[in-house]
Regions:
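Adenosine-phosphate binding glycine-rich loop
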Residues: 64-172
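Long hydrophobic segments that form regular secondary structure
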Residues: 25-79
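Glycine-rich phosphate/diphosphate-binding loop of Rossmann-like nucleotide-binding domains
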Residues: 1-44, 171
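Short acidic, glycine/serine/threonine-rich loops at helix termini
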Residues: 3-11, 51-53, 73-78, 97
Length: 172
């Protein structure tokens, strides 16, 4: 997407176009991933090919999060040169999925009877997730905790509750 795109836009695409793709690149996906460091996909299965990944910068990062079938499967992305790959699926490393955040976000909000779930609370959840991986553990196949890591829910809930208090939406 890009600002000013005339077709297939909606309000969220319009907002995203304002904060992403600042160079307003247009064309096919193959055109715009050439030379890119990162691909973030949340759209449709099979959209990204190994040939496209090969045109990206060396050691590219590919987040292929369409679910249940990603834009490209991890083995193909890695074979094409991607250094870090994630999907929305639990059967591959680096699952990026809302299942990591939602239970803890709601637990934290309920614990303080938050009147709203606001941006500071969402950011607190993201920071809590990232803090669970130590620098020693961080590697290409472990950039985010696993969904069933028992630390995830409590860490996210505590961070969200604290952010609710700090942002004034906690009622207890």
């Amino acid at each position: 997407i890009y600002a000013g795109r005339p077709e297939n836009m909606n309000w969220i695409k319009t907002e995203m176009a304002e904060v992403t793709n600042l160079r307003r690149q247009a064309g096919t996906l193959a055109d715009v991933v050439r030379g890119a460091d990162v691909f973030i996909g949340v759209s449709q299965p099979g959209l990204l090919t190994g040939d496209m990944v090969r045109t990206m910068h060396r050691d590219a990062i590919v987040f292929a999060c369409a679910n249940p079938t990603p834009e490209i499967f991890p083995d193909e992305a890695r074979a094409a040169g991607a250094a870090v790959v994630s999907t929305g699926r639990s059967d591959y490393p680096n699952q990026i999925n809302n299942v990591l955040a939602f239970p803890g976000i709601f637990r934290g909000a309920f614990d303080v009877r938050a009147s709203d779930i606001n941006e500071p609370m969402k950011l607190a959840a993201a920071h809590a997730l990232s803090a669970l991986i130590t620098p020693e553990e961080l590697c290409a196949d472990y950039i985010i905790p696993k969904a069933f890591d028992p630390r995830v829910g409590p860490a996210v809930a505590a961070a969200v509750a604290q952010a609710a208090r700090a942002s004034g939406v906690a009622r207890i």
